[in-house]
Regions:
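Peripheral, non-AAA+ core regions of ATP-driven protein-machinery
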Residues: 359-368, 374-387, 391-393, 409-419, ...
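Generic beta-structure capping elements
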Residues: 25, 182, 603-605, 655
Length: 814
């Protein structure tokens, strides 16, 4: 059952630079297509093509996989062939001021309408000024005013005549109009009144009372006369305004005969101007009519100081919130800060005389408005972090309308009078970007999510490594270098990058499509090329970038290795010991991982077949590690204790472990330590072991095999390579090996060895130097084999247990 050590060419799958037919990446063209994401691209193509309800897309992939750039390029390519969506405008609703109306215009015509309406209002202002200042209008206006004056004059003349007939005259006093007696044209003073008889005074008072009642009738008619005059003045204003602005509006309406919504708006606008022409004329500095007031309206902010436009004219603007005049194809919008208002739009307010006021001109578009008719990209984590944003987006997608809402109004925190803009019809394809765990969490806990986002575009972080993909990868490198304005990469440097890409995914048969990691490596390689004064990135520049990145992150690794070298952490790399073995684990520090050897010990005693995981007992072991330990008991019982009870109690521990332990990659090492303790056969300490094991004794693959091998190699190298040292790995992990060059060179010099094993029996033979032993037909193992010693050791424990149980029972009887 001999196992051959791995050859150097099995430890690292190199990328021969000779396979490339270019000298540097300057000679290569950028990739026309996307690389390594066929599944995600198929999902995107399907999701974009499906126009049914709920076929929005969730792009799931880890950060750095390049999903944003890929999706953006994909969407822009698709959008270029699509129609430009319409412009979106808000205009005043003259019937309900707080409910502005929308106008959906063909692309580029919204701003055109706004400019035409602005010019129209200039013409209206000039026409009104000319009409109201004309001699004819002034004469008619004066005639209306004269009518009121004549009525008042006739009424007072009648009162005057009646007063004279009664020897009285009207006098104006602070208390009102009074009538005083006269003699010979002179008003009688109080002393003269006293000289009159009672009868004469009574007669005068009676006449004065009659006149007072007549005067009261006149005063009661004056407000009615004034109302009649005002109505005539308004009608005069309307007639003059209609005559002045009618032709102006008719000309503009004729341009939009095929757009009923626009002509309807222009008609209501004309009617409002006709009804409020006096207000417009007053705002322009004209002579308004006394007592005339504008129609009811919300308070509006004034920007007269900035634009020269009066507040009264704001109501006739066209607020273009989405202008697609310069858009080519359908829009592709990325919302980086997806708050509720940034998504759905908002109504701004200004402080005006101590109150917050607004109007339809202060409606602002959200990203859903700008992306309407196209595509909206949103980071799902960011939208979940914003209050009300996620619910607002779902509500818009469900209803197919964009309704502008403020967070304060949604929770009734404020009672400020605001607007209720008419909702905008929504036609958009939303692409959420996020990590896979978020996708599955939202899908599990939000029942509406699956109804709205029916398409999942799953982005891979690796792709197959074959000659065609390696050539495509070289073009990818060329494209990134050009985009980032980096030095060209020589073909030897390209080969090195490809090898490092395989190392990044921990698989010699795969390449990383983690675009952020690749781009960072290329940038850093370019930096070292410039530092070295070359004009092309070489292999040594790429290697320097790799080494420098490790050096910046490996302080903790060096500290641990120093503690091992100084015997603060006890790790043996020579000799043999019973029940002790070197296990291997991986420590992750951000994006840097390194291997660390750990001393695992096993101790046995008489018991009831339990294997105690000390890490679990003190709550330092994870569930996967505990599962691996329980598998060991199953293996021991099934293989060695079929004819007698498993009568041992064993304890396993990672010595000098002061943090949590999880994973089952050390379960084979723990089993070897147990077998050594049971058989009392020492294990070589010059070897380290990694690999999980099943109940049948098969060694299973693990992760981080490269880091684990290198971690033990570094310790052995620091103490001096003896040629006896090495690492035992699962045979199925050979395909994942992309070891450092110094490890490969040590193996080539026979200073270090890598042993691939498939079964526990193969591993125990390497560790002890003794044969494992195969059972015969009777189930007996060859003498002096490891399995025979284990079998005998467990049988002896069973006999002791039986003897102990028997003596204990006899003692109790006695």
């Amino acid at each position: 059952m001999a196992v051959n050590t791995l050859k150097p060419d099995q430890l690292r799958v190199c990328c021969p630079a000779e396979q490339f037919d270019f000298d540097s990446t300057d000679e290569l063209e950028d990739l026309d297509d996307f690389i390594g994401q066929p599944r995600a691209l198929a999902a995107l193509d399907f999701g974009i093509g499906m126009r049914g309800d709920g076929y929005h897309i969730f792009a799931l992939g880890e950060n750095g996989t390049g999903k944003y750039s890929l999706i953006r390029r994909f969407l822009e390519k698709q959008a270029a062939a699509e129609e430009v969506p319409p412009d979106i405008c808000y205009v005043n609703n003259f019937d309900e001021q707080h409910k502005p109306r929308i106008l959906v215009m063909e692309a580029g015509t919204g701003k055109e309408l706004a400019d035409r309406v602005k010019n129209l209002m200039e013409d209206v202002r000039n026409a009104l000024r000319a009409a109201f200042e004309s001699e004819d209008f002034q004469a008619r206006r004066q005639s209306v005013q004269q009518e009121l004056q004549e009525k008042q004059q006739k009424a007072f003349e009648k009162l005057q005549q009646m007063s004279q007939e009664r020897d009285l005259t009207p006098l104006r006093t602070p208390a009102g109009l009074v009538f005083a007696p006269v003699r010979d044209g002179e008003v009688l003073d109080p002393s003269e009144l006293e000289k009159l008889s009672e009868e004469e005074r009574g007669e005068l008072e009676k006449k004065a009372e009659e006149l007072q009642q007549e005067a009261q009738k006149v005063f009661q008619k004056i407000p009615q006369w004034q109302r009649e005059i005002r109505e005539k003045q308004k009608e005069l204003n309307r007639e003059a305004t209609q005559y002045a602005v009618g032709p102006v509006f008719e000309e503009l309406r004729s341009r939009y005969e095929d757009k009923p919504a626009v002509t309807e708006y222009l008609e209501s606008m004309e009617k409002d101007i006709v009804d409020n022409a006096h207000v417009l004329f007053q705002s322009e500095g004209g002579q308004g009519q006394a007592g005339e007031q504008p129609s009811p309206n919300l308070p509006v902010p004034s920007d007269q100081g900035q634009t020269g436009e009066s507040p009264a004219l704001r109501r006739y603007r066209v607020n273009v919130i989405v202008d697609n005049s310069k858009t080519r194809g359908s829009p592709v919008v990325h919302e980086d800060n997806p708050t509720l208002q940034n998504l759905l739009g908002r109504v701004e307010h200004l402080a005006h005389m101590g109150a917050l006021v607004t109007d339809f001109n202060m409606i602002r578009a959200g990203s859903l408005h700008r992306a309407n008719g196209g595509y909206l990209m949103v980071d799902v984590l960011k939208i979940l972090q914003q209050p009300f944003a996620w619910e607002g987006l779902k509500r818009a997608l469900r209803s197919g309308r964009i309704t502008i809402e403020s967070p304060g109004q949604m929770v009734s925190l404020i009672s400020t009078v605001s607007l209720e803009p008419e909702p905008v019809p929504l036609n958009v394809k939303v692409i959420l970007l996020g990590a896979p765990r978020l996708y599955y969490l939202i899908r599990q806990y939000d029942p509406e999510f699956g109804e709205l986002f029916k398409v999942g575009a799953d982005f891979a972080h690796r792709m197959d490594r074959d000659p065609d993909n390696q050539k495509a990868y070289s073009r990818l490198i060329a494209g990134v270098a050009r985009k980032e304005k980096l030095y060209p990469f020589g073909r030897d440097a390209v080969a090195k990058v490809i090898e490092q890409s395989a190392r990044m995914v921990g698989d010699s048969r795969k390449l990383s499509v983690h675009m952020q990691g690749l781009t960072d490596l290329l940038r850093e390689s370019d930096y070292w090329a410039r530092q070295n004064g070359t004009e092309r990135v070489r292999t040594e520049d790429v290697q320097k970038a790799i080494d420098a990145r490790i050096f910046r992150s490996d302080r903790l690794r060096e500290m641990m290795q120093e503690q091992i070298r100084r015997d603060v952490i006890l790790i043996d790399t020579e000799g043999s010991k019973v029940g002790q073995i070197n296990g291997l684990s991986v420590i992750m520090l951000g994006d840097f991982a390194f291997g660390r050897p750990s001393r695992i010990t096993a101790r046995i005693r008489l018991g009831k077949g339990d294997v105690v995981d000390i890490e679990r007992e003190v709550a330092m072991g994870g569930p996967i590690h505990s599962k691996g330990v329980l598998i060991l008991a199953g293996y021991l019982g099934a293989r060695y204790a079929m004819h007698h009870p498993l009568s041992l109690s064993a304890s396993l521990v990672f010595e000098q472990s002061y943090s949590g332990v999880d994973g089952d990659s050390a379960s084979s090492a723990e089993l070897y330590a147990l077998l050594s303790a049971i058989a009392e056969v020492p294990i070589k300490q010059s070897l380290a072991v990694t690999g999980s094991v099943d109940q049948l004794g098969r060694v299973q693959p693990i992760g981080g095999v490269n880091e684990k091998i290198e971690g033990f190699f570094d310790i052995c190298k620091s103490r001096g390579l003896s040629g006896e040292q090495g690492v035992m790995i699962p045979a199925s992990n050979i395909q994942h090996l992309m070891l450092r060059n110094d490890v490969v060179e040590a193996v080539e010099d026979n200073a270090f060895s890598i042993y691939p094993v498939e079964t526990v029996d193969q591993g125990i033979e390497i560790l002890t130097g003794l044969p494992a032993g195969e059972p015969d037909d009777a189930g007996r193992y060859p003498a002096d084999s490891i399995n025979a010693r284990v079998f005998e050791g467990l049988a002896e424990l069973a006999r002791r247990r039986k003897a102990f149980s028997g003596s204990g029972t006899q003692a109790m009887k006695e």
